[in-house]
């Protein structure tokens, strides 16, 4: 029996497709990118779509190409995501996100005693570690606190 495959989300003329997002993280990707109801371009997303490696999310953004900083933020919550740049309905560039080794001012330290959470004008600073067993974790350079599970919830 032949399996029927339908296109679930309309193709975009130009913009960005973020594929292979960790399942359940599409809304966090939109938040990372600062996309809200005020954003006027077309945005499509699919959550929990079947993929070769299990379930995944996909986000399509019409008329927007992502900056390096935006890609770094996405990598923190979905290090296996791929970015496709679309022009005239054709993929002109395809890249994997690259997990940065260091981030500054991107995530709030969850240690309430950390100096980056005080009234001082200090941006948070983290070294980024990835392991097969534990995934992505952030190590605060000020207080040495480790964040792993709640990265998405503490993005600035």
Swiss-Prot record:
GO terms for biological process: 'de novo' pyrimidine nucleobase biosynthetic process; pyrimidine nucleotide biosynthetic process. GO terms for molecular function: metal ion binding. This is Aspartate carbamoyltransferase regulatory chain. InterPro entries: Asp_carbamoyltransf_reg_N, Asp_carbamoylTrfase_reg, Asp_carbamoyltrfase_reg_C, Asp_carbatrfase_reg_C_sf, Asp_carbatrfase_reg_N_sf. Keywords: Metal-binding, Pyrimidine biosynthesis, Zinc. Signal peptide: none annotated. The keyword Disulfide bond does not apply. Zn(2+) binds at residues 109, 114, 140, 143. It comes from the Archaea. GO terms for cellular component: aspartate carbamoyltransferase complex. Involved in allosteric regulation of aspartate carbamoyltransferase. Contains catalytic and regulatory chains. Belongs to the PyrI family.
């Amino acid at each position: 029996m032949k399996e029927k495959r339908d296109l679930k989300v309309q193709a975009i003329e130009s913009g960005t497709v973020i594929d292979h997002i960790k399942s359940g993280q599409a809304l966090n990707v939109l938040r990372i990118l600062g996309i809200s109801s005020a954003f006027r371009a077309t945005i499509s997303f699919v959550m929990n779509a079947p993929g070769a490696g299990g379930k995944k999310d996909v986000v399509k953004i019409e008329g927007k190409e992502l900056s390096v900083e935006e890609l770094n933020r996405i990598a923190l919550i979905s290090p296996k995501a791929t970015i496709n740049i679309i022009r005239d309905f054709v993929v002109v560039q395809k890249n994997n996100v690259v997990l940065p080794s260091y981030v500054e001012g991107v995530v709030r330290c969850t240690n309430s005693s950390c100096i980056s959470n005080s009234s001082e004008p200090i941006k948070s600073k983290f070294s980024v570690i990835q392991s097969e067993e534990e995934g992505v974790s952030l190590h605060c350079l000020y207080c040495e606190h480790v964040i792993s599970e709640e990265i998405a919830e503490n993005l600035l």
